[in-house]
Amino acid sequence: MPIRILPPILANQIAAGEVVERPSSVVKELVENSLDAGADRVEIDIDKGGAKLIRIRDNGCGVAKDELVLALSRHATSKVATLDDLEGICSLGFRGEALASISSVSRLTFTSRTQDQSEAWQAQAEGREMNVTVKPAAHPVGTTVEVVDLFFNTPARRKFMRSEKTEFAHIDELVRRIALSRFDVTLILRHNGKVMRQYKAANTVAEQERRLAAVCGTPFMHHALAVESEHSDVRLWGWLALPEGARPQNDLQYTYVNGRMMRDKLINHAIRQAYDELLPTDRFAAYVLYIELDPHQVDVNVHPAKHEVRFHQARLIHDFIFQALFTALRREGVSAAHQEEPLAETLVELPVSGQIEYPGQAPRPEWYGAEHSYRAPASTNEVREGSAARAGNYQPPEPPSREAMRSMGALLTTLPGAGPASAASATAAMVPSAAAQTAPGVWQALTLVEQAYLLLVRDGQLALLSLVRAERLLLRNWLLEAWGQGLAAQPLLLPVSFKLPKNLIALVEAQERLLKRMGLELKSGGRDTMILTRVPALLRQTDLVRLLPELLQIIESGSDSDASQLAEVLCQWLVEQGISHEKIYDFSTANRLLTELVADFSDQLADIRMVRPVSLTTVLEAFAHDG
C-alpha cells in the first residue's frame, strides 16, 4: 500500500481515539473550552448518558463569525502562538484538536455570539472532507455546543460504551471535579431533562465550604483540616481529612495543578507518605488539594487527555507537598490508626510502663530527670506543651530478678508456617493450636493483636510482645554501635528554618560536632534564625520545626554530663522520634523483629517490660461459673 495523506475525517477520527474516550471526555473538553472563554455560568445537558445528546451552554466571550470555520479545524487555537506560549500555558486547552475530533465522531453543532456581534452564527462540519457550513442563529452572548449521536459513524467505539447509568456516573464525577476547581463558576448538570447537580458560584470562604460539602459530603467536612503552605514560588492549599475521616475507597481524592484536574503519581506518592503509619492498609485518605506554581516550571503537554503533568523540579515539589501535609497532620495532634494503650485487666497482669527500657540498661544521669522550662518562640510553632517533660522524665526501672528471667526467659522462635490470624484487631488472646503445642518450652508466634503486639504461646501460657518496644530496642542498640562513626546525613531539598533564642544559637555553634554526629547540619540564617540543611534518614519524615528546639534543650541540659551518658540519652531520643507509638505492623515485619531480637538478646527477652504475660484465668472462671 503506497504512502498517502489521510482524508481529514479519518485523521480526525484517529485523533479522537485519544481525545474522546467516552461521553465524559467530550464533556471535559467542551467545559474546559467554556472556562477558557471566561464563562462564569455553564449548563450541561445530557441525554441517555451522553450517547444521544451532550449540550454545553456558557456565557463566555464567544467566537466571532470569521473564526467559526477555524474553530472546527484541526490544530486551530487562540491559546498558543509560539513555543514560549506553550511552555508557560495557563489555559486548560491549547492543542486545538477537541472540536475537530469530536465533530468527526458525532453530529456537532457550534453556535456562538460575541459581545460585538448583533446576531449569533452556527457552524457544522459535514461530509468526508469535513467542510464547515455557517448560518445565522438566535443565541445570547456566549456559546452552545451540541453533540448528537456520539460514535454514530464508528460502531466499534459505540459498542464499547457502557450502560447509560455508568456513563452518566462518569460525567457526574467529572462535573464534581470541575466544581472543585472553579468555585467562581455556576455549574448546572441535567440528565434526561432533570436537574441532577447545581453548584452556585462560591466567592466567600463560607460558600466555598458549602460547595465542598455538597461535592465531598458532610462527613468529609466534619474531619476536614484546612492546610496552606508556601515555599519560594510554590503554594499548596486546600483541605485534607484527618485519619478518622479515612474512607474504604479512594473516591475522595482531588488534586489540581494551576487549576487543572490532575491524577499525578508524584503528587499521590507524596500524599501517601504524609499519611504513612496514620492509616491502616485498607483505608484511604480523602483530600482536595491545590498546587500553584510558575507555569514555566510544569509541563502539561505530556498526556493526550492532560491527566498528568511533568514537574521540572519533581523532587522539590514532592518534598514540599510531603512536608507541608506531614507537618499539618502532626501539628493538629492527630492520632494514628493504633495507639499503644494499657490492655484490659482480664488480659494483662502487669501495667504498661510509660518508657522503653532494656536488659542491663545504664542508669540515667541525674540531670536528665529534671523538668525544663524552655519554650520555643511562637513563630517557630512552639513545642507542644509537655514535650520537654516527656523527653526529660526517663526514670531507670528496677532490673528484672533472676526468678522473673527464668520464669519467662526461654528462647523466642517463630513456629514454621505460622501466619496472621483472621482479624488482628481483637484484644482477646487466641487458644494455642495443636501444632503450637508440639514445641514445649519454646515461645511461638501466633498472631498480631491490634497491629502492634505479637501474641506468643509457650506450654499453654500466653504472652504479648510489644513490637514498638522491640523495634525501639533494636534501633537503639544499632545507634549506639554507630555513634562513634556518626549517622549518615541526607540533604533536605527544602531546608527548614526556625528562630531560636541567643543561648540556643550559641549552643548550636558550640555543639556543631555533636550535631553532625547525629546527622544534623545547621547554618546561620540571620540574627536569630538557624537553617537545617541535612538530617539523618530516621528524622526525615518528622516535624523538624517542633523537634529541633526540643533536641537542643536536651543537649543544653546535659552539656556538663559524661559524653557516654549524653550519647545514651540522645540515641534514646532519636529512637523515640523515629519510631512512633502509633506505628502499625504486619505479621511478616513482626516475625522479622522477633528473629532479630532472638539473634541479639537470646534469653534476655524475658524482660517483662517488653514481653508481658496474658492471663485467661478470669475468662475461664467466668465460663466455668456459667456452667
Curated annotation (Swiss-Prot):
GO biological process: mismatch repair
SUPFAM superfamilies noted in UniProt: ATPase domain of HSP90 chaperone/DNA topoisomerase II/histidine kinase (SSF55874), DNA mismatch repair protein MutL (SSF118116), Ribosomal protein S5 domain 2-like (SSF54211)
Gene Ontology molecular-function annotations: ATP binding; ATP hydrolysis activity; ATP-dependent DNA damage sensor activity; mismatched DNA binding
Region (Disordered) location: 376-404
SMART domains found in the cross-reference section: DNA_mis_repair, MutL_C
Domain of life of the source: Bacteria
Entries under CDD domains matching the protein: HATPase_MutL-MLH-PMS-like, MutL_Trans_MutL
Record's keyword terms, sorted: DNA damage, DNA repair
Entry GO terms, CC: mismatch repair complex
PROSITE patterns xref list: DNA_MISMATCH_REPAIR_1
One Pfam family hit: HATPase_c_3
NCBIfam families assigned to the protein according to its UniProt record, in alphabetical order: mutl (TIGR00585), PRK00095.1-1 (NF000948)
Family: Belongs to the DNA mismatch repair MutL/HexB family.
Function: This protein is involved in the repair of mismatches in DNA. It is required for dam-dependent methyl-directed DNA mismatch repair. May act as a 'molecular matchmaker', a protein that promotes the formation of a stable complex between two or more DNA-binding proteins in an ATP-dependent manner without itself being part of a final effector complex.
Name of protein: DNA mismatch repair protein MutL
Organism the protein comes from: Aeromonas salmonicida (strain A449)
